[in-house]
């Protein structure tokens, strides 16, 4: 592997000159630049990121902890983060924890050892232990996204899940629905608690009694949506509408209901949550609650860059507000 000394020898200049040409830290005559660049190309020389990080006290690297990168919502946020990292000359290290404590612990340790400039956290399974681990590395700038916990050591972006649950349920009520089921994720997750709170607030405003039997626990994946669809089919009094806590479950639910001869939205209306790309192209196209996923990714990265530049800045909370995207899966009854 070629070294900076090899480049300097081939170009007939000093190693200092080579460094200035590569890093653009001082004026170097054009003819000399051409010699150095030609030598770099001939030797296929790659500057040492380790050496540069020691000199500049930055690795131009960001770590990102996620629960599951294959989740369609997470993957679209990650895509936004990666895109903005690349544009700003940063490398993204993606750590897929699967919600496993040991992996979370080991990845945080690894990111600290690699001297990342900052960490983005987007995990649905965040425990007090994980928060303490993050707080232990107070010297590393952090931004917590989506379902993460409050931390004295990190900026936070919140998605206003309660507001989203309220908007989705109110949308159905305004179209004449009063028997509204909801298919949640795990009921102990903060986002689910908040969306159920919003669901109940909308029902209460409309003087509709919330029926706990209409709250079906899922896991944000298609398999539980299929089980939920079968439960709904067996109900003596079926709901006229179902509010699903993410689009993945909504699409799974619709697929199963249609397979059993139940038409969407003629027989049962469905509204989702997240507005993933696939939602628009399903049949029928899914009405859903929009979350600006790529903007969340962009904002998170920009906030983290600010924190990297000014570690002593007061910790902040940034709010994102959901909105309804109207398509073809909700029938108006009144």
UniProtKB/Swiss-Prot annotation:
<feature type="binding site">
    <location>
        <position position="189"/>
    </location>
    <ligand>
        <name>hypoxanthine</name>
    </ligand>
</feature>
<dbReference type="Pfam" id="PF00356">
    <property type="entry name" value="LacI"/>
</dbReference>
<comment type="function">
    <text>Is the main repressor of the genes involved in the de novo synthesis of purine nucleotides, regulating purB, purC, purEK, purF, purHD, purL, purMN and guaBA expression. PurR is allosterically activated to bind its cognate DNA by binding the purine corepressors, hypoxanthine or guanine, thereby effecting transcription repression.</text>
</comment>
<comment type="subunit">
    <text>Homodimer.</text>
</comment>
<dbReference type="GO" id="GO:0000976">
    <property type="term" value="F:transcription cis-regulatory region binding"/>
</dbReference>
<dbReference type="InterPro" id="IPR000843">
    <property type="entry name" value="HTH_LacI"/>
</dbReference>
<dbReference type="GO" id="GO:0003700">
    <property type="term" value="F:DNA-binding transcription factor activity"/>
</dbReference>
<feature type="DNA-binding region" description="H-T-H motif">
    <location>
        <begin position="4"/>
        <end position="23"/>
    </location>
</feature>
<dbReference type="InterPro" id="IPR023588">
    <property type="entry name" value="Tscrpt_reg_HTH_PurR"/>
</dbReference>
<dbReference type="Pfam" id="PF13377">
    <property type="entry name" value="Peripla_BP_3"/>
</dbReference>
<feature type="domain" description="HTH lacI-type">
    <location>
        <begin position="2"/>
        <end position="56"/>
    </location>
</feature>
<protein>
    <recommendedName>
        <fullName>HTH-type transcriptional repressor PurR</fullName>
    </recommendedName>
</protein>
<dbReference type="InterPro" id="IPR028082">
    <property type="entry name" value="Peripla_BP_I"/>
</dbReference>
<feature type="DNA-binding region">
    <location>
        <begin position="48"/>
        <end position="56"/>
    </location>
</feature>
<keyword id="KW-0658">Purine biosynthesis</keyword>
<dbReference type="InterPro" id="IPR010982">
    <property type="entry name" value="Lambda_DNA-bd_dom_sf"/>
</dbReference>
<keyword id="KW-0804">Transcription</keyword>
<feature type="binding site">
    <location>
        <position position="274"/>
    </location>
    <ligand>
        <name>hypoxanthine</name>
    </ligand>
</feature>
<feature type="binding site">
    <location>
        <position position="220"/>
    </location>
    <ligand>
        <name>hypoxanthine</name>
    </ligand>
</feature>
<comment type="pathway">
    <text>Purine metabolism; purine nucleotide biosynthesis [regulation].</text>
</comment>
<dbReference type="InterPro" id="IPR046335">
    <property type="entry name" value="LacI/GalR-like_sensor"/>
</dbReference>
<dbReference type="GO" id="GO:0006164">
    <property type="term" value="P:purine nucleotide biosynthetic process"/>
</dbReference>
<keyword id="KW-0678">Repressor</keyword>
<dbReference type="GO" id="GO:0045892">
    <property type="term" value="P:negative regulation of DNA-templated transcription"/>
</dbReference>
<feature type="binding site">
    <location>
        <position position="73"/>
    </location>
    <ligand>
        <name>hypoxanthine</name>
    </ligand>
</feature>
<keyword id="KW-0805">Transcription regulation</keyword>
<keyword id="KW-0238">DNA-binding</keyword>
């Amino acid at each position: 592997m070629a070294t900076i000394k090899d480049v300097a020898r081939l170009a007939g200049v000093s190693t200092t000159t080579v460094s200035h040409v590569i890093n653009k830290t001082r004026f170097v005559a054009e003819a000399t630049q051409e010699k150095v660049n030609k030598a770099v190309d001939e030797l296929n020389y790659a500057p040492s990121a380790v050496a540069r990080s020691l000199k500049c006290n930055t690795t131009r690297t960001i770590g990102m902890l996620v629960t599951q990168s294959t989740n369609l919502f997470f993957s679209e946020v990650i895509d936004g983060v990666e895109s903005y990292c690349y544009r700003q000359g940063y490398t993204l290290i993606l750590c897929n924890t699967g919600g496993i404590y040991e992996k979370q612990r080991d990845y945080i340790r690894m990111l600290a050892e690699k001297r990342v400039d900052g960490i983005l956290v987007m995990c649905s399974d965040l425990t007090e232990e994980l928060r303490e681990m993050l707080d232990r590395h107070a010297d590393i700038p952090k931004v917590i996204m989506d379902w993460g916990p409050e931390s004295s050591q990190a900026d936070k972006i919140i998605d206003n899940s309660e507001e989203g649950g309220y908007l989705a349920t109110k949308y159905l009520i305004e179209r004449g629905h009063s028997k509204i089921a909801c298919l949640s994720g795990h009921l102990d997750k903060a986002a689910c608690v908040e969306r159920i709170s919003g669901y109940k607030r909308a029902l209460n405003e409309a003087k509709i009694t919330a029926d706990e039997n209409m709250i079906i626990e899922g896991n944000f994946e298609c398999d539980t949506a299929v089980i939920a669809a079968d439960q709904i089919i067996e109900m003596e009094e079926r709901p006229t509408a179902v509010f699903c806590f993410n689009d993945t479950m909504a699409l799974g639910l619709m697929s199963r209901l249609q397979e059993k001869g139940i038409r969407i939205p003629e027989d049962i209306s469905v509204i989702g949550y997240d507005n993933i790309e696939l939602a628009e192209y399903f049949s029928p196209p899914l009405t859903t609650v929009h979350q600006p996923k790529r903007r969340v990714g962009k904002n998170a990265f920009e906030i983290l860059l600010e924190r990297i530049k000014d570690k002593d800045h007061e910790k902040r909370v940034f709010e994102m507000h959901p909105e309804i995207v109207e398509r073809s899966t909700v029938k108006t009854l009144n």
